[in-house]
Amino acid sequence: MADCHISLHWDGDGLNYDKGSFYISVPDSVKGMEPVASHWTQHNALGASLVDGLRAQGCKINGGGSMSIDLTQTSYSTIPSVDMELGNACSNHSDETLNIQAEGLLRGINAYYGR
């Protein structure tokens, strides 16, 4: 079994500007249901660590770094699981930028696991 699940996305939202990165947090409406109730804090902690890692690398962060949406793939997972939005179609997708984002995500993973 995997230690965690991180799904990487760039929104196709039609915006004409780079909105930055954020993670999809677990909404209050499902936090009381199992298996969500037993695992949502892990999901949100992983997401927050990833955003902190991206921020430390100088990546643009959208708002407070999270948006609450009920996603079955993450909310109902029994391992730490998060959907990371790394920008959109207007974001810089150069190798340099992707490497910076990769370093930020690695930094966040290491922080989450106390490395």
Predicted regions and their residues:
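Active-site-proximal helix/loop segments of hydrolytic enzymes
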Residues: 1-115
